[in-house]
């Protein structure tokens, strides 16, 4: 089983927007729209109080390329719209190395940082008991 939870607040820059030409802001917005329009994961930009964001949940019996593609989309957007911030949590119990751990992808200031989560991991016994036959 794979479980992916992700969110990304989309912000054009982490720098002072007053010093960035409007044309540059619009170019960033267009690039983000292009990424979303051309993704194969059915991601779409949502808005709350005028702020664009992504909110993603995937729960599948087996890992597919979808999780990797979602991480790639979040990464591309955060590299272009460098003020974007958010995270993705992934638990893939078929992953040979991390089957018992949540893996996190943290997005901030145009970077994606990968870490093994310590809040829910190891998943057994932190969030589930071991099954005994």
Go through the PLM ranges and name each one.
Residues 1-29:
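Short, extreme N-terminal segment that most often corresponds to the first beta-strand
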Residues 4, 41-45, 89:
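Beta-strand-enriched cores of mature, soluble protein domains
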Residues 14-17, 62-68, 94-101:
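Short, surface-exposed beta-strand/loop "edge" segments at domain boundaries and coil↔beta transitions
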Residues 83-96:
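A short amphipathic beta-strand at an alpha->beta junction
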């Amino acid at each position: 089983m794979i479980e992916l939870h992700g969110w990304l607040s989309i912000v054009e820059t982490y720098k002072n927007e007053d010093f960035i030409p409007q044309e540059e802001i619009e170019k960033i917005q267009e690039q983000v729209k292009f990424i979303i329009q051309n993704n194969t994961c059915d991601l779409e930009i949502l808005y709350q109080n005028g702020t664009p964001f992504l909110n993603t949940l995937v729960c599948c019996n087996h890992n597919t390329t979808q999780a990797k593609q979602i991480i790639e989309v979040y990464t591309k957007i955060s590299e272009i719209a460098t003020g974007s911030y958010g995270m993705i949590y992934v638990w893939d119990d078929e992953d040979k190395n991390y089957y018992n751990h949540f893996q996190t992808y943290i997005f901030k200031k145009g970077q994606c940082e990968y870490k093994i989560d310590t809040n829910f991991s190891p998943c057994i016994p932190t969030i589930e008991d071991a099954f005994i036959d």
